[in-house]
């Protein structure tokens, strides 16, 4: 558990191995050159490959943000970071005959509360208010079914192919990064790996994060994932202004 109680956004982060032998998730939280940077990565590939890939993702993100901010705009920093991460993992795979990959949802938050968000795969960023939940769109097979109206979000949580991704970092020479901009504006920022949002409904996530401080919210979200029979690694960051 990581908790910040100083000036600026109050945030906490927590990662749980769940029913797995190892934790292939990684996360980053920190202040970088006047911005707050948050990220969750969920590694793929097994046999420690995913653990390596997710760690590479958050380390290269931190390094790129430190080098580029504030001279370069946050959206462009995210684009460059994702390109570097993808290239680094792709090269690592070629050199070692591996198939490591990772998801990544990364957020750069400015002093005004504006959030720049980059996502590959199905790790997810949410902006939660007492009455609504906005979240990034998963790059996954079932998200395509939801978007086309074939199944509902509730049905997607039970779909047998819910873990099939259409994009991941490190598995191809090029990757499509989804970029978004949102205002935090009194809401709560929640970034999670799919061990949370594949098992815990949005209504429960909203109830927990709007009623609790970030530290307590993280603990209760992890507990909710376990109660929902999540056997996956689960990582969550909760931040509020």
Question: Across the structure, where does each feature detected by a protein language model lie?
Answer:
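PP2C/PPM-type serine/threonine phosphatase catalytic domain
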Residues: 1-241
